[in-house]
UniProtKB/Swiss-Prot annotation:
GO terms for molecular function: methenyltetrahydrofolate cyclohydrolase activity; methylenetetrahydrofolate dehydrogenase (NADP+) activity. Belongs to the tetrahydrofolate dehydrogenase/cyclohydrolase family. This is Bifunctional protein FolD. Pathway: One-carbon metabolism; tetrahydrofolate interconversion. Catalyzes the oxidation of 5,10-methylenetetrahydrofolate to 5,10-methenyltetrahydrofolate and then the hydrolysis of 5,10-methenyltetrahydrofolate to 10-formyltetrahydrofolate. It comes from Paramagnetospirillum magneticum (strain ATCC 700264 / AMB-1) (Magnetospirillum magneticum).
Length: 295
C-alpha cells in the first residue's frame, strides 16, 4: 500500500490568507471599513510572544489593522478587564484575542466572558459556544475550524462518515465534535476513560487527534484509508539530546495506513492563525451589518 496523501496546511492556509486579503481590499473599497484585530499579551511567556508577533505580522499582511497590547506579568485582573472593556467599545477593533495562558492570579474564564461575543474571534465565549452547539452563526474556535476546512478540502462532503474526536477540551475536542455533527457526521468523542480506544478509532473514517500525548495513536489503530487530522503539538527529546516536534499520532506507522494525514509541523498549526484572520473579517462584516463574507 502506498503512503497516505499529506494534507498540506501551509499551502491551504496561504490560499486562505490570499482570499482574506482580497475580501479585506473589497471591504475597504466598497465600505471604507478596515477590519481590526486587538491581541492582548500578559507576561513574558516566550512561546506566547512568538505567537503574538506572528499574529500581528499576518494581520498586517492581509491589510487589516493590528493592535497589540503587551502587559507586565503582574498586571492586576481588574486592569486587564478594564482594557477588554475599552476594546469592546472601540469601533476600530472588530476582533479581540487575549493570548492564553494568562498568569495564575488572573481568572481565565472571567477574561473570556468579559470579551464582547461579537468580537470573540477565539470563539471561547459561552455565547459562541452555545450558538455553535445550537447550530447557529457562531464565531468558531480557530483550531477546530482550520481542521474542518482541511477535512472538507480533502474529502468534499462529510455527511454520513464516522468520525472520532480523541480529546474533549473546550478549545478543540468539544467544538470539533459540534462542527462534525453540523456536517452530518456520526461522531464519537473519546478520551482517557474510553474503553478499547484502539477499537473505537479503528471504526472511524475520520480521526481527529487532540489529546496532548505524543505519538499516542498508532498506525494499527487506524482504519485503512481513513483521514487523520493531528492537532497535537508536542516537543520530545530524542536519544541524542536534540528536540523534535511530534503530533498525537505516531506519524511513521499511521502514514502507511491512512488515506490522508496532516504532518506535524505543517498541518493544522498554520491553519489556526489563518482562521483567526477569517474570524476577524467575519466579525467585522457582522458588526457593520454587511452581507456574510464568502470564502
Amino acid at each position: 500500500m502506498t503512503d497516505a496523501k499529506l494534507i498540506d496546511g501551509n499551502l491551504f492556509s496561504a490560499k486562505l490568507r490570499e482570499t482574506i486579503t482580497a475580501r479585506v481590499a473589497e471591504m475597504k473599497a466598497a465600505h471604507h471599513i478596515t477590519p481590526g484585530l486587538a491581541v492582548v499579551l500578559v507576561g513574558e511567556d516566550p512561546a506566547s510572544q512568538v505567537y503574538v508577533r506572528t499574529k500581528g505580522k499576518r494581520t498586517v499582511e492581509t491589510g487589516m489593522r493590528s493592535f497589540e497590547h503587551k502587559l507586565p506579568a503582574d498586571t492586576p485582573e481588574d486592569a486587564l478587564l478594564l482594557l477588554i472593556e475599552s476594546l469592546n467599545k472601540d469601533p476600530e477593533v472588530h476582533g479581540i484575542l487575549v493570548q492564553l495562558p494568562v498568569p495564575k492570579h488572573i481568572d481565565t474564564q472571567k477574561v473570556i466572558e468579559a470579551i464582547d461575543p461579537a468580537k470573540d474571534v477565539d470563539g471561547f465565549h459561552p455565547v459562541n459556544v452555545g450558538r455553535l452547539a445550537a447550530g447557529g452563526d457562531a464565531l468558531v474556535p480557530c483550531t477546530p475550524l482550520g481542521s474542518l476546512l482541511l477535512l472538507k478540502d480533502t474529502l468534499g462532503k462529510l455527511g454520513g462518515l464516522d468520525a472520532v474526536v480523541i480529546g474533549r477540551s473546550n478549545i478543540v475536542g468539544k467544538p470539533m465534535a459540534q462542527l462534525l455533527i453540523k456536517e452530518s457526521c456520526t461522531v464519537t468523542v473519546a478520551h482517557s476513560q474510553t474503553k478499547d480506544l484502539p477499537g473505537v478509532v479503528r471504526r472511524a473514517d475520520i480521526v481527529i487527534a487532540a489529546v496532548g500525548r505524543p505519538e499516542m495513536i498508532k498506525g494499527d489503530w487506524i482504519k485503512p484509508g481513513a483521514t487523520v487530522i493531528d492537532v497535537g503539538i508536542n516537543r520530545i527529546e530524542l536519544p541524542d539530546g536534540t528536540k523534535k516536534l511530534v503530533g498525537d499520532v505516531d506519524f511513521a506507522s499511521a502514514v502507511k495506513v491512512a488515506g490522508a494525514i496532516t504532518p506535524v509541523p505543517g498541518g493544522v498549526g498554520p491553519m489556526t492563525i489563518a482562521c483567526l484572520l477569517r474570524n476577524t473579517l467575519v466579525a467585522c462584516a457582522r458588526l457593520h451589518k454587511l452581507p456574510e463574507v464568502e470564502f
